[in-house]
């Protein structure tokens, strides 16, 4: 789950299962790349890479690698994300984030995706 825990992404391992139309989540095709889970997402509706307004177009392709590792005796997962958008970016946008496995879900507090106009749902458009 992403976005504070109330959205679900579906990774397909078979390209034949991908939907044709663009969505906020896009169509994600997953495969194993050595020990990394590689996920390539296409067919997203235009949106923002970050909350502060870096836009991406419906032509953007997001490639992610999910890597599990042990550091300092604890389980971690690192997600490396590359956004390639020929319409809005002059170069690829690359970021990595690391997450530590917790013993339980006692600190997990899922929140809905909201904007200043209320809850966000599929099909919403935010124009300036």
Where are these regions (language model features)?
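Hydrophobic small-molecule pocket/channel-lining residues, especially in calycin-type beta-barrels
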Residues: 1-128
């Amino acid at each position: 789950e992403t976005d504070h825990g109330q959205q679900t992404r579906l990774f397909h391992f078979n390209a034949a299962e991908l939907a044709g139309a663009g969505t906020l989540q896009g169509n994600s095709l997953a495969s194993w790349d050595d020990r990394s889970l590689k996920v390539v997402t296409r067919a997203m509706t235009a949106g923002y890479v970050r909350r502060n307004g870096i836009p991406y177009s419906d032509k953007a392709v997001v490639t992610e690698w999910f890597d599990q590792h042990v550091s300092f005796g604890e389980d971690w997962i690192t997600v490396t994300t590359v956004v390639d958008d020929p319409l809005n970016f002059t170069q690829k946008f690359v970021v990595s984030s690391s997450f530590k496995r917790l013993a339980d879900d006692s600190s997990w507090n899922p929140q809905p995706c909201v904007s200043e106009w209320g809850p966000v749902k599929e099909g919403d458009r935010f124009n300036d």
